[in-house]
Regions:
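Cofactor-binding loop segments of dinucleotide-utilizing enzymes, especially the Rossmann-like FAD-
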Residues: 13, 33, 128
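Surface-exposed, flexible loop/turn segments at secondary-structure boundaries
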Residues: 16, 36-38, 131
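A short beta-strand-loop structural module common to alpha/beta enzyme folds
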Residues: 28-38
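Anionic-ligand binding patches
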Residues: 2-6, 48-206
Length: 206
């Protein structure tokens, strides 16, 4: 059996996922959907009727992996394992996606203020017919925020490409009272689970 390539494709437009992979020394190349594009393969991130948060995040991640792998083959790129991930924030079973404007960002902060919510990040690795997937859930507790604080934060650019409308590695770090889980997972790539996944596939991380 031919040894697996130790360099992977990362099919994600998230700069945070790139930083996290570099942190643990994983060699990767970005897999872009189009030439000169910073976007990863497009997969509609629409919640299906009655779909639970866990089922949603795992389905979207799997579809991203399938799309990215097909892109690699159609473009006749060197065959390598493809890594994808998706993060979703949920409160009381409700999925909080990426806010589309000030009003939606403010409403999300009001929901999260003083409450504990869950951040689910699913990671998938696809190599031809082989497929591995893992999902990590973290509990995040927000402090009780003043209306002034929430309005000030929702007016910043920071919330608008983040699930749940906040960035734990940004100014929203000051809102976080307690975390039970993976800090890197909340950022978008749980490093322990990701490296375990890579090792299962035969990719060395040290």
């Amino acid at each position: 059996m031919k040894p697996i390539d130790q360099k992977i494709y990362l099919a994600s437009k998230s700069p945070r996922r790139r930083e996290l992979l570099r942190q643990v020394g994983v060699e990767f190349e970005l897999l872009l959907l189009r030439e000169n594009s910073a976007r990863g393969p497009d997969v509609p991130e629409l919640v299906q009727p009655g779909e639970a948060p866990l089922a949603y995040v795992e389905r979207v991640t799997r579809e991203k992996a399938e799309t990215a792998s097909a892109t690699m083959l159609s473009r006749r790129l060197r065959v390598r394992p493809v890594l994808t991930a998706d993060t979703t924030v949920t409160l009381d079973g409700r999925i909080l996606g990426k806010p589309e404007g000030d009003a939606e960002a403010l409403e999300m902060l009001r929901l999260l203020s003083g409450r504990t919510h869950q951040v689910l990040t699913s990671v998938a690795l696809k190599h031809l017919d082989d497929f591995w997937q893992v999902t990590h859930t973290s509990d995040v507790t927000f402090a009780t925020l003043t209306e002034e604080t929430m309005r000030a934060y929702s007016a910043l650019p920071e919330p608008y490409d983040k699930a749940g409308g906040y960035a734990i590695q940004g100014r929203a770090a000051q809102f976080i009272k307690h975390i039970a889980g993976s800090h890197s997972g909340i950022m978008g790539l749980p490093l322990y689970e990701t490296t375990q996944l890579l090792q299962q596939a035969g990719i060395r991380t040290l």
